[in-house]
Design a protein with these regions (language model features):
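Conserved acidic, metal-coordinating active-site core of Asp-based
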Residues: 76
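Conserved phosphate-donor
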Residues: 82
Length: 246
């Protein structure tokens, strides 16, 4: 018998603990409900799009692998409940209202939707939630999300499987690097202009440079930018080094 091992095995049960995403944690603080939108939940554990819940077979496999460690909880015990868009995810509690409004004017009782992350929000905002639709989000990082008409047959390390807020299977390809290198070049042009006393609106600067790019050669004059400000898992680089080649 070892106290440390005993606490490790029973700590989740003793504390009523669970694990979740940032959206799920905020939702719990505001409503007291340990729930998660199916899209965000799919980033924590594989989802069965038929049941709109965690993949039961994979849950069983995990618990079987964890059994020798003697935990008195199963994985399902510590995962938040999965909800799809439109389902009741609880209401704002008095405690949650105080977190949002320290003046006390906001009242409790407001119904709250299932918590989702930015990926699910982007799919809904671009109306890309139906089968064979997709959207691209480009910023500091970039990813494409395609709603699948059938399950993938093989494992593709470049693809993460997530879901829409309504539980449809989605293939996501994500890259860490997108606009950081472009922003650095635009900042260089801005600094150049400022050095000559010219004050240029940043939005106008982007617009002019984007339109100027349309006048360039199809092969960009033989110029090539590797925008790896950080590592890139999809191409197996642990660290990034920006490179501009001629």
């Amino acid at each position: 018998f070892n106290l440390a091992n005993f606490m490790r095995v029973h700590l989740f049960t003793a504390l009523g603990a669970f694990f979740t995403t940032l959206a799920g944690f905020i939702h719990w603080k505001l409503t007291g409900e340990k729930v998660l939108g199916v899209g965000d939940a799919s980033g924590m554990f594989p989802i069965d799009s038929n049941t709109k819940d965690y993949d039961a077979a994979m849950l069983d496999k995990f618990d079987a692998l964890a059994e020798p460690y003697g935990f008195d909880w199963s994985l399902r015990d510590i995962l938040p409940k999965v909800l799809v868009a439109g389902e009741n995810a609880g209401t704002l509690t008095a405690e949650g209202a105080r977190l949002l409004d320290i003046d006390g004017e906001l009242e409790a009782g407001i119904p709250v939707c299932p918590p989702e992350g930015d990926a699910g929000t982007g799919m809904a905002a671009t109306n890309s939630v139906a089968v064979r639709t997709g959207n691209v989000s480009a910023g500091t990082s970039v990813f494409a999300m395609i709603v699948l008409e059938k399950a993938l047959k093989n494992v593709h390390t470049e693809i993460d499987l997530v879901t829409t807020p309504s539980g449809e299977a989605v293939a996501m390809a994500h890259c860490n690097n997108c606009t950081s290198d472009l922003n650095a070049w635009v900042n260089l042009f801005e600094e150049f202009a400022n050095s000559f006393g010219m004050k240029i609106d940043k939005n106008e600067l982007f617009s002019v440079l984007y339109n100027k790019a349309l006048e360039g050669d199809a092969d960009c004059g033989g110029l090539l930018a590797y925008n790896y400000f950080s590592g890139e898992g999809i191409t197996a680089f642990d660290e990034g080094r920006p490179l501009f080649a001629r």
